[in-house]
Structures are given as C-alpha cells and as structure tokens.
C-alpha cells in the first residue's frame, strides 16, 4: 500500500524552535511547518548540489574571499534559473499532496521564502562548501 503522505512526514526532522501559531500568515506557517523541515532533510543534497554547481562554473567560488562567496551563493540562486529550478525540485519533491496544493495557491511568495532559506542555509554552512569536506559529511 502506498502511504506517501505518512512516509514523507515520518522521515522529516522535527524542528522545535520554529512553531506555528494562529496569528502567523499562511506563508509563514507553511515556511515553519513544511519548508524548514524539508530543507533540513535535504541539507546534504543542497550542499552537494551547490558544490557541484560551483565546480561546473570553473571552481572560482573556492578561491574567492568569504564576503564574495556569500554574494556568489546569493547571485547563483537569484540569477541562474536552471539551478534555482533544480533546487526547487529537490524541495517540492518532498511535499505531501496537501502541501503541494497549498504551495500552488501561493507559489510566488513561497518560492521567494524557499530560495531565501536556501541562500541562508548555504551561507551559514560556508565551511562545508568544499568538495573534500562535503564528501566526508555525506
């Protein structure tokens, strides 16, 4: 029997710090209840995907100063539509059908939140965005 909904929910990490409240907007509730757990679950894949992206773009990312690396991450996600769509696919593919339906009702605002969270997550883990380190954190 295919129980995709419960299987997806079961494998997601619990994030206690970010709760949902009645006075939150629908987007903020979706961000805390769905996006943050999915991003945490997909974190190793997001890191590996960015490292692969940087390598395929001549590897300059690894040789530039930290402030420029931060800008590079933001620029790559905002300006490279193909890369951004790949990241969105990694995240949306972990939605339940109910979450996907909610997402489609307000995808523009939720995409913006999603990409801002991905940028922050990659920037916060800058020390892991090195091919040798990443292969050991798997």
Question: At which residue positions do the language-model features occur?
Answer:
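Membrane-interacting alpha-helical segments
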Residues: 58-73, 125, 130-132
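Short, well-structured hydrophobic secondary-structure segments
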Residues: 32-62
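Short acidic/polar alpha-helix capping motifs at helix-coil junctions
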Residues: 12-13, 49-55, 63-67, 138
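Long, highly charged low-complexity segments enriched in Glu/Asp and Lys/Arg with interspersed Ser/Thr
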Residues: 106-138
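N-terminal leader/targeting peptides and immediately adjacent processing regions
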Residues: 1-37
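Amphipathic protein-protein interaction modules
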Residues: 65-115
């Amino acid at each position: 029997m295919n129980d995709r909904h419960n299987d997806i929910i079961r494998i997601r990490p619990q994030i206690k710090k970010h709760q949902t409240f009645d006075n939150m907007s629908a987007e903020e509730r979706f961000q805390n209840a769905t996006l943050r757990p999915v991003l945490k679950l997909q974190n190793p894949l997001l890191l590996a995907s960015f490292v692969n992206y940087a390598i395929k773009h001549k590897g300059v990312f690894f040789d530039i100063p930290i402030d420029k690396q931060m800008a590079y991450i933001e620029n790559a996600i905002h300006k490279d539509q193909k890369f951004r769509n790949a990241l969105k696919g990694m995240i949306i593919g972990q939605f339940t059908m109910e979450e996907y339906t909610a997402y489609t009702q307000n995808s523009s605002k939720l995409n913006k939140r999603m990409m801002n969270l991905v940028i922050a997550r990659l920037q916060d883990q800058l020390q892991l965005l090195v091919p040798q380190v990443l292969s050991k954190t798997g």
